[in-house]
């Protein structure tokens, strides 16, 4: 698994599934380049830890790095899709439980125009 690929798709999914105060999705206006450095570093740290802690289950799942990043964001934040609904059985359940350990993250636009979470 390539951390940077997982992280990239995690960030894309985060922007896609998060909204501004007016309800517009963040990805309609912002890209991963707009994520504040400290928020991106936190995302990187969470993704790296998740990959390391769940390497065996992730390998067995057969999911691509892109899917892992996407599903990690959706699952940890309790969205209506994620590891649990891919038909992975016990592996999906284990990855879902592991994702929940990281808690939810809420993104917002700071006064400086960067995305924080």
Please tell me what each predicted stretch does.
Residues 1-63:
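Long, contiguous N-terminal structural blocks used for assembly/anchoring
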Residues 45-113:
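Amphipathic protein-protein interaction modules
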